[in-house]
Amino acid sequence: MAMAKGLIFLGAPGSGKGTQAVGLAETLGIPHISTGDMLRQAIADGTELGNQAKGYMDKGELVPDQLILGLIEERLGHKDAKAGWILDGFPRNVNQAIFLDELLVNIGHRTHWVINLKVPDEVIVERLLARGRADDNETTIRNRLLVYTEQTAPLMAYYQEQGKLYSLDGNQPVEAIATNLEKLVKP
């Protein structure tokens, strides 16, 4: 049996990683797995994991890694993920990456590529301010970028050491990024 082709998308808020992950998933015919969407769905469906997650979220706490990994394991067990998958929003730190690697080995999957969309901070600030969300002001955005950079720098180094990290210029037209992604991942 061929091993599933696993892709992880990294990028700061506003980098376009969600847009690109969804587009590439459609092109390749594999699922785009957003941990945020999965959590919301599990809560809406009233699953055991969803109810546990809701308990943490209602208290304003982060959902524990093991709970998220449970959701990911369940999702990767679906038939549509056998040929591959794109994970968006997880892992966010090295501990999560190590847990994820162990989980993937246990279920016969592996990460082939970790794709990082690089976009200058100034461009991200402009993009997020242009969205016009109530909670998006320049100070908040810059703080989120700082936290993101601090959290993900060690994660990038982790995947770089494994030879899996590919950084792409995310400061170009959506179509150009999509073309570059397809060239990278298509055999």
Curated annotation (Swiss-Prot):
Binding site for ATP: 14-19, 131, 172
GO biological process, one term: nucleoside monophosphate metabolic process
Keywords noted in UniProt: ATP-binding, Cytoplasm, Kinase, Nucleotide biosynthesis, Nucleotide-binding, Transferase
Region described as NMP: spans on this chain: 34-63
Binding site for AMP: 35, 40, 61-63, 89-92, 96, 133, 144
One GO location term (cellular component): cytoplasm
Sequence similarity: Belongs to the adenylate kinase family.
Subunit structure: Monomer.
Domain characteristics, as noted in the entry: Consists of three domains, a large central CORE domain and two small peripheral domains, NMPbind and LID, which undergo movements during catalysis. The LID domain closes over the site of phosphoryl transfer upon ATP binding. Assembling and dissambling the active center during each catalytic cycle provides an effective means to prevent ATP hydrolysis.
Name of this protein: Adenylate kinase 1
Origin organism lineage: Bacteria, Bacillati, Cyanobacteriota, Cyanophyceae, Synechococcales
